[in-house]
Amino acid sequence: MLNEVLENTERFMSSVPKTKRKKYGQFFTNETTAKFMASLFCFDLSKQKIEILDAGAGTGILAAAVIQKLYELGYVGKIYVTCYETDELVMPLLEENMALCNKLHNVSYTLSSTYKCNFLGADNKQ
């Protein structure tokens, strides 16, 4: 799953000029960094649900790495992901990548393109 998300992101990056990506600060997480960051999370695998907040989701690479890590660890509960991203150009790919996570691992997700709410107060009850 993570590999497909990375491939989708690479396609996106090659379709958008670097100068435009630079203007928006678009430098997406690479595979090594995403896997390393996912390894830093401490998960309680006995929980029936785990909620993930990705406050600068980009194309969903980090969220996908965390989801993949959970399944590699044998997690069998429900995963909820809340993604925030301000770049409207990236949103369709973020949607595509989160839909892939849903298809492969039944992950529920919410996407938002605004930062008008308090992340700590964001509520994703499903």
Language-model-derived ranges and their functions:
Residues M1-Q126:
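SAM-dependent methyltransferase catalytic region
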